[in-house]
Design a protein with these regions (language model features):
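Glycine-rich ThDP/TPP pyrophosphate-binding loop and its adjacent helix/strand module
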Residues: 1-182
Length: 183
């Protein structure tokens, strides 16, 4: 069952409800509920309530994956509402915590395999990512969060007419692995 949660912060609460339902029906040993969430969602109170509830009920069939990119729509997470030490906070609510580089697909796969082997509590995978990775004018810049390239001019960045072309070229030649198609 795939579900888009709508309001920011409600996805984990919905996932906890699904995991509790499976536990009540005895299905918590053969399937998992995944909640993909952003670090910015930690500003919402219901996220913390869901974390506590899942830990209390030892929802071993629940795996949360947090995109820890350090930005949200209005700025950097640590400037708006500091989250660190984030792993310690999840752990304090009785979650097993796994931290990985979010751009390393092999590490993510291994983290999910590790999560499947935890039987006494829910698991959170904190995936440390770089927003806009590989695009020089968007990388780590919250001003691009939620806005597609080519739709607006941002001071100091390429004009909107050139943004997509530049971004595609940079992504295709990321780390020199592919030759440019747009030179």
């Amino acid at each position: 069952l795939e579900n888009s949660s709508g309001p920011l912060g409600s996805g984990l609460s919905q996932a906890v409800g699904m995991a509790i339902s499976d536990k009540m029906d005895g299905r918590d040993k053969d399937r998992f509920i995944y909640a993909m969430m952003s670090d910015g969602e930690h500003n919402e109170g219901n996220t913390w309530e869901a974390m506590m509830l899942a830990g209390k009920h030892k929802l071993r069939n629940l795996i949360a994956i947090v995109d820890r990119n350090n930005i949200q729509i209005d700025g950097y997470t640590e400037d708006i509402m500091p989250l660190e030490p984030l792993a310690d906070k999840w752990s304090a609510f009785n979650w097993h915590v796994i931290s990985v580089g979010g751009h390393d697909f092999q590490a993510l796969y291994q983290a999910i395999e590790e999560a499947h082997a935890i039987y006494e509590k829910p698991v959170v995978i904190i995936a440390h990512t770089i927003p806009g990775k590989g695009v020089h004018f968007a990388e780590r810049d919250f001003r691009w969060h939620g806005d597609p390239l080519g739709k607006k001019d941002v001071a100091g960045d390429p004009p909107k007419e050139e943004q997509v072309k530049i971004a595609l070229n940079e992504l295709r030649t990321l780390e020199g692995k592919i030759r440019s198609e747009h030179q």
